[in-house]
């Protein structure tokens, strides 16, 4: 009897370990994903400049070092590291200070060098500050909060610029833009939601207005497009899903139609803006949960781990993100792979 009971208990333990370790036959185990993240963070730490920044390979595509630095800081946070503590704490703190130093005094815009799309950079930097605000040393906390308040005000002012009905509620490349797209809107909405979550003054009406724009970009057959009625894609569908999920539209019909679309047409490595897409699709489908997350998790981890370089990096060597370089791609990959840790507040279900 005792031998039988011992066998049953051992079988249950092994079954539980197998279930935790292997999400699907052929998909990377949790340990393999963990090791991949560790290698990626070591790579990122080796690439930080003396100034505290992480540079883009080429700043001509509308992003700059401020956005890449913010993504790198969030990548460390997503893996459980805290500014000012542990092996990467000092590097993270230097990165945060560098971003703060690159906020324009006249209007609060984050920008390191001129580019065609400064609102991309601004949204990413604002999101990062909202995520670290409660984790930084008290000596830095007040500065982060004041910077965040100015950054949020600029986002709200940019949303309020008069736009036609098709574009109302969203954002585009510049604070003064009178049109919108889902890509820029996604970063601003994530930033506002994260800031509101920590008690910043973000009117509910601004969130609702932005959600109304996101819904305009949805397709009745499932998925989201760059502009309303522009043609759906996996990358934009991930953006739409995440935006709606974090704004209270959990598993809403529009969200689920897009999630079903992503199961039918999952993200591919040769898709335009793959690393942008892998972040949004992964985090968005994690929020949806259930079979949608299970299938996405297995697909994305297999895809990313097979493309990781021996030094721990990912490098968009060709295509739409080729000029962004490995710091950007590696940060986005870690943000996708680390979603199940739920260390970043925006990741929490």
How does the language model describe each region?
Residues 25-42, 50-91, 104-208, 216-260, ...:
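An alpha-helical repeat/solenoid feature that recognizes helix-turn-helix modules
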Residues 18-24:
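Sec/Tat signal peptide C-region and signal peptidase I cleavage site
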Residues 1-3:
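N-terminal secretory signal peptides that target proteins for export/translocation
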Residues 6-17:
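Bacterial N-terminal signal peptides
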Residues 304-305:
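TPR/TPR-like (Sel1-like) alpha-helical repeat modules
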């Amino acid at each position: 009897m005792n031998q039988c009971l011992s066998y049953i208990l051992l079988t249950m333990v092994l079954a539980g370990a197998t279930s935790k370790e292997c999400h699907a036959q052929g998909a990377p185990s949790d340990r393999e994903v963990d090791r991949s993240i560790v290698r990626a963070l070591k790579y990122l730490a080796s690439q930080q400049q003396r100034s505290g920044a992480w540079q883009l390979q080429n700043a001509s595509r509308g992003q700059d070092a401020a956005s890449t630095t913010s993504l790198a800081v969030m990548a460390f946070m997503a893996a459980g590291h805290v500014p000012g503590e542990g092996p990467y704490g000092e590097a993270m703190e230097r990165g945060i200070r560098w971003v703060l130093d690159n906020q324009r005094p006249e209007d609060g815009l984050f920008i390191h060098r001129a580019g065609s799309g400064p609102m991309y950079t601004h949204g990413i930097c604002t999101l990062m500050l909202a995520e670290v605000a409660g984790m930084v040393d008290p000596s830095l906390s007040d500065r982060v909060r004041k910077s965040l308040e100015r950054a949020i005000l600029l986002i709200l002012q940019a949303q309020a610029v008069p736009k036609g009905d098709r574009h109302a509620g969203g954002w585009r490349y510049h604070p003064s833009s009178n049109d919108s797209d889902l890509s820029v809107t996604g970063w601003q909405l994530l930033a506002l939601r994260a800031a509101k979550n920590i008690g910043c003054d973000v009117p509910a009406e601004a969130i609702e207005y932005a959600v109304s724009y996101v819904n305009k970009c949805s397709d009745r057959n499932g998925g989201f497009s760059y502009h309303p009625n522009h043609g759906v894609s996996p990358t934009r569908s991930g953006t739409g899903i995440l935006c709606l999920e974090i704004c209270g539209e959990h598993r809403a019909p529009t969200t689920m139609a897009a999630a079903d679309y992503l199961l039918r047409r999952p993200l591919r490595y040769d898709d335009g803006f793959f690393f942008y897409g892998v972040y949004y699709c992964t985090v968005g489908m994690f929020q949806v949960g259930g079979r949608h997350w299970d299938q996405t998790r297995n697909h994305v981890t297999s895809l990313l781990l097979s493309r990781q370089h021996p030094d721990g990096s990912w490098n968009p060597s060709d295509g739409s993100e080729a000029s962004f370089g490995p710091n950007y791609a590696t940060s986005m990959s870690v943000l996708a792979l680390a979603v199940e840790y739920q260390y970043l507040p925006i990741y929490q279900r």
